[in-house]
Amino acid sequence: MAKKAPDVGNYQYGFHDEDVSIFRSERGLTENIVREISNMKEEPEWMLNYRLKSLKQFYKMPMPQWGGDLSELDFDDITYYVKPSENTERSWDEVPEEIKRTFDKLGIPEAEQKYLAGVSAQYESEVVYHNMEKELEDKGIIFKDTDSALRENEELFKQYFSTVVPAADNKFSALNSAVWSGGSFIYVPKNIKLDTPLQAYFRINSENMGQFERTLIIADEGASVNYVEGCTAPVYSTSSLHSAVVEIIVHKDAHVRYTTIQNWANNVYNLVTKRTLVYENGNMEWVDGNLGSKLTMKYPNCVLMGEGAKGSTLSIAFAGKGQVQDAGAKMIHKAPNTSSTIVSKSISKDGGKVVYRGIVHFGRKAKGARSNIECDTLILDNESTSDTIPYNEVFNDNISLEHEAKVSKVSEEQLFYLMSRGISEEEATEMIVMGFIEPFTKELPMEYAVEMNRLIKFEMEGSIG
């Protein structure tokens, strides 16, 4: 059995609703469960075979011996598939009332009405609501849940699925490949530039639940898309598992920005594989906000395949009591004149632990490639810790690599300066933290910047005394 989760304090999205699911698999991971998931979804035979092969791969692979402590994660105590409703609705009014109330509390309809081009909401294992502006459909943009894409766009789906993150990549990508459900599928045709964000929202509601969405984004030549996802879960005494796979293909001269704002409860293991292939003069941006969870292990990866390809990761990690944020980035330079940037901001308080773990690789063909890495950590008390673990591989002597790492505490001089102007110690500390994360929040859409600042302020409550 999974052990009792650590104290979660006043986590604001910790409410949970009565179980209204129409189907729930038995706990534990077996071949029968995998077949049941595929059968429920009425999938083609090739996908069932892919799932079963992935399950065998999962059993063969050992648990990671690096990163956070996974010893309490019990795969036999997890529910791998929960179907919350019969259909994916295109009208908000048609979403089941109990589920709608949850997303109303989280502001999903409000956010859509304000500025989103399309929105998808996943509850447990399935997308329960999906909508996109008609003018985008008229341009040939495909934005739907991944299960629908498999049914309705099978040829395009099969062309790209599992080409970026194969099942055998790691133990948790194998697990996802065996039991994946939901997620987003996006295809943007050649030279179509979408400035307004597409959004997906992922919510775990049940105890001991596993959520395994699979997201696949293809930006064709000269295309551009901005995708934003948000994640929350209730507070329970036992652990839940979120293990997603994200695959992105950025074709020649295309641009993708992928923004994540996660605020999981302290009983969630968040173990995610994100990777993109970036071709000639393409540009990939990861903007990654990591709050909450018991343990996060996530390292967005750019494989720079074509000359002039660019990749960047801008991340923030906040670890409080009982939390470990083991996050970072990977930049793989495979072509000439490629460039990458990693900016990592980490904050730890109340005994939390933050780890930056990154890889920058320069291949033999990466002549003229360059990479810049900046890791800044702010530690708010004597109980909290931080580690920086960079790993650089260089197989070409014509490259440029810069790495800067800095760990600091809130200084008495900073506090004295602010407090001498009538500001309390708690408010002064909050101001210093908000200034520290400003390079991250300024890259977010306005509504998300406001929400991120609010979440950080919420995490900061009670930091003094």
UniProtKB/Swiss-Prot annotation:
Name of the protein in its database record: Iron-sulfur cluster assembly SufBD family protein SSP1857
Pfam families according to UniProt: SUFBD_core, SufBD_N
Family that this chain belongs to: Belongs to the iron-sulfur cluster assembly SufBD family.
InterPro entries: Fe-S_cluster_assembly_SufBD, SUF_FeS_clus_asmbl_SufB, SUF_FeS_clus_asmbl_SufBD_core, SUF_FeS_clus_asmbl_SufBD_sf, SufBD_N
PANTHER family: FES CLUSTER ASSEMBLY PROTEIN SUF, UPF0051 PROTEIN ABCI8, CHLOROPLASTIC-RELATED
GO biological process: iron-sulfur cluster assembly
Domain of life: Bacteria
